[in-house]
Design a protein with these regions (language model features):
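Internal helical hairpin/lid segments
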Residues: 251-341
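Metallocofactor- and cofactor-centric catalytic cores in central/energy metabolism, strongly enriched
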Residues: 23-154, 168, 180, 189, ...
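A conserved active-site cap/scaffold subdomain adjacent to cofactor or substrate pockets
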Residues: 209-272
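Active-site histidine-anchored catalytic micro-motif
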Residues: 151-161, 166-216, 222
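Glycine-rich beta-alpha junction loops
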Residues: 58-61, 164-166, 192-196, 217-220, ...
Length: 394
């Protein structure tokens, strides 16, 4: 089994091939092999001659980096920057408030993934609405919400559609099925966002320090990575499609450094065991049918053109914003929450004065401390003993 992992991980990483003479491993552990991780880290040290800043755009990668101490294995010249890789975290405050408004209405069953229930809006959160007798339910698939609509014809069932390209096909399928079933009591509050436009927005910023990207493997498994080469060429940044396990991330970093050190700026696929260049074309076809590309506001970043998905004209009847007559209104972020700077990679979570004091998972100021993929939550869970005292001292 370990030989298979080696062959999957290291076919294209220069001339570096870790030894494979080891006993078989459990499949769940094979991409967490400590010896292979050390060998990858040594190779990164060997090839690194200059300082480089690499951003991961995936909350799962961020949590793996912090949980397994991947950044602590790297040479001092390598800085990992945590980007806007958590879809819950970038959902704008205004959209949370719209969800709260709908969920509090009588006759509504409001459904959502569990992560969204504790994300603070401007005054409260969905969990508090539920505690005050709002019918707020956690579902594990948008299709569960469709079933609820079938089972409760006298109720308005709303699903909060949040996520990157990864979850968009499931949301699209739910809308498609609702249309096929003729459900008049089902609608979607849509806040899906697209990753490539966000990368472009980050690179266009005058404050951007990013020199290479680890692209999210799960996003590319759906959408492929044909959108990335123009960005790599335009901004002269290596982009490596990367998985989520420690060996995946270390290899992705190594591939980035090899490109940076040799002056290349290309798109490479570290996660070839799960990602193809064209992605999942049937899923893409469904997304194109149900959705259209729209501007979308990202929490902490602002509006990014063509960075979101909204329902297409053929499925506009399922738009919860229109059905419930929700208008647009501006809401200011809490002044003492710096999650926007965290999402842009300008500061690390523990550099926020509120971290670990005024802001904890039990009493969060922002979504980055609530979500299972949030950078602040990762630092609090895995590093609070090493960073909280420093934060509190401020």
């Amino acid at each position: 089994m370990r030989q298979r992992v080696v062959s999957l991980l290291f076919p294209s990483v220069g001339t570096f091939h870790p030894l494979a003479e080891k006993a078989q491993m459990k499949y769940l552990d094979e991409y967490r092999d400590g010896e292979l991780a050390q060998q990858l880290a040594r190779e990164i040290h060997r090839v690194t001659t200059r300082p480089w800043n690499i951003m991961e755009v995936c909350g799962g990668q961020t949590h793996a980096i912090v949980k397994f101490g991947i950044d602590e294995l790297l040479p001092n010249q390598i800085t990992l920057i945590h980007g806007p890789g958590c879809p819950v975290c970038v959902t704008p405050l205004e959209m949370i408030d719209k969800a709260l408004e709908i969920a509090a209405r009588p006759g509504v069953i409001f459904t959502s993934f569990g992560d969204m229930l504790r994300v603070p809006g401007s005054t409260t959160d969905l969990l508090s609405v539920k505690a005050r007798s709002g019918d707020v339910r956690i579902v594990y698939s948008p299709l569960d919400a469709v079933k609820l609509a079938e089972q409760n014809p006298a109720k308005e069932v709303v699903f909060f559609g949040v996520g990157f390209e990864t979850t968009a096909p499931a949301t699209a399928m739910a809308v498609f099925q609702a249309a096929q079933k003729g459900l008049k009591n089902f609608s979607m509050l849509i806040s899906h966002v697209l990753v490539p436009p966000a990368i472009e927005a980050l690179m266009s910023s005058p404050n951007c320090r990013v020199q290479a990207f680890l692209a999210a493997g799960h996003v590319c498994a759906i959408m492929g990575y044909e959108e990335y080469p123009p960005l790599a060429v335009k901004y002269r940044v290596p982009i490596v499609v990367t998985g989520f396990e420690p060996l995946d991330i270390l290899q992705g970093i190594l591939m980035c450094v090899q490109q940076l050190e040799s002056g290349r700026a290309e798109v490479e696929n570290q996660y070839a065991r799960a990602v193809r260049k064209q992605g999942n074309q049937p899923a893409q076809k469904l997304v194109r049918e149900v959705f259209r590309v729209v501007p979308r506001k990202w929490r902490g970043i602002g509006e990014i053109p063509a960075s979101g998905l909204g329902l297409s004209a053929a499925y506009a009847a399922f738009d919860a914003e229109k059905r419930f007559g929700l208008g647009n209104h501006h809401v200011d972020e809490p002044a003492d929450c710096l999650s926007g700077l965290v999402l842009q990679g300008q500061i690390k979570p523990h550099e926020c004065p509120a971290f670990g004091g005024k802001c904890t998972p039990e009493h969060p100021l922002g979504a980055t401390m609530v979500s299972s993929e949030g950078a602040c939550a990762a630092y609090y869970r895995y590093r609070r003993h090493s960073v909280t005292e420093t934060a509190l001292a401020r």
